[in-house]
Structure formats: C-alpha cells, structure tokens
Amino acid sequence: MDELCTIRAVIGLLVPVEWLAKHHDAVRLLDVRGEVVDGEPRYRAYPERYQAGHLPGAVFVDWRHDFTDRSATVPVTVAGPSEFAAEATRLGIGATTTVVAYDGYRNVLAGRIVWVLRSYGHHAAFVLDGGLGAWTAAGLALEPGRVVPEPAVPPHPVPVRMEGLIDLDGMRRAIDLGAQVVDARKELEYAGGETHARRAGHIPGALNVPHRSLLAEDGTFLEPDQLRARLRAAGVDLDRPIVAYCNGGVSATAVAHAVELAGAPRPTVYDGSWNEWGNRDDTPAEMG
C-alpha cells in the first residue's frame, strides 16, 4: 500500500501499464468501452466486448448512463451530487478508493469519467496511459465474464461542490470574462461543414484544437513539450483561463487533460457543449 500512496501523490493523470500490472488488484478498475460514431445511435457502449475480455477485476461503466443526469434533455449531462455519490457507491468507489479507468477509444471516454470524478473532488482517479491497447500490447492477460462490484462501505460521500465543469450560464459568464474557448471537435465540424446539432459552426472566438491532434497513433498523449507546441500553434495561451467544449463534453476532457499535462492550470469543460449550444436559438455561432 505504500507504493499505492506514492503513485497517488506523484502522478498527475496517467498511470503507466507497468505500474498497473503490479497493482490492478489494489484499485477499482473501470472499463469504459464505447464509441461516438457518425451513424445512429451516435453514442454507443460495448458491454459485449467487455464480457469477452477485460482487465482482471474491471467493472463495466456504460458512459452513456452512468454518472449522467438521465432526466436531462441534453445527452450525457453530468449527474448531480447525490446521483454521483450513489453511482460511485454502486461501483464500489468509496472516498479513499483509487480508481483507474480505461477504454478502447483513445481513452476519451475513460478520460471523461476521470474528469467527472475529479470535478466532484475524487482526485485519486487516473487514466491508463494507452488504454486497453497498451495492456494487450504488453502481453498482459484479459479475463472474460462480468464483475459485479460490492457497494462501497461506507458509501461515497455526497460532494459539496463541483469544480471543472460549467453549464450554459457558466459558459456565458466565462465568455463575458474573456476566457479562452477551445473547440475540441474536428475541423469540419468547427468550420460548419458538418454538424450533429440543429445549427452548425462554433462558439464565436473559439480556437480549434481537435482532440486527436494531441494523441499519438497508439492513443497515448503526446509528450508535454509536444502538447505545448501543438496548443500554442493553435493560438492557445497556456497562461490564461481555458474553457473547452466539443459536442457532448466528452472529447473536450481530452483537450483539458492535455492542457494539464502540458503544465498549465486545470481548464474548465462546458458540460452541454455543442449538443446544447448548437440546438438553441439564443446562442451565437460563427462559421468558417
């Protein structure tokens, strides 16, 4: 447990596969496999792939529903404090549980779950660097079937505040205060040539940093100096406050994590993102 405490203290976000191979039985592993596709349904989860083979002891998380507000009109809106605590408890996550999440989708979905955990104050939450691919590439075994977690005892406390996620009103205030807005979607969506909302385009003044541009081919994040170079080349000032958005507040967390890995202060993520902004009549949009 001493080494477990050490990794909590010194690691920022990413857990290397070599460490996890030794300590996977001492953490709560979350398998967040799924995808965002251009077809319908756009948001997909893959429990069947999980059951075919997952990291030993991993619990499946359906990112479309778990840790979300299921009554919200905007898809995958983050759950409120009470619902968050209940979901964490169900998954066996108590106040002191170390969590490591992974997926097979460039760790975008795992990163979203970790962002939510940390935003609600559960800072002992990390992403497996390279995700499922890194584990299998290292020759490490998977196990089939479904792991049913024991609820956490005592239950996870209800958070008293959230930091790192904002709603529509918070986004408007951030813009009024001059925050940098970063659009994590692909260039075609940013320019307005493609949209998954009623309206196309981007939030006026937003800089475009597609989240994939910050990842290596194997799904790992680029090195900090490379991240700084990519972000600055896109016009991002790492010394100023940053708010990131995408379509549903998911890939925006990859950009936000990249900003942190680059050594800058923790950004904020607009939860509703373009799913909300692009479907309203009272929000401005730019094309091109």
Where in this protein do the model-derived segments appear?
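Cytosolic catalytic domains that perform sulfur/thiol-centered chemistry
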Residues: 2-288
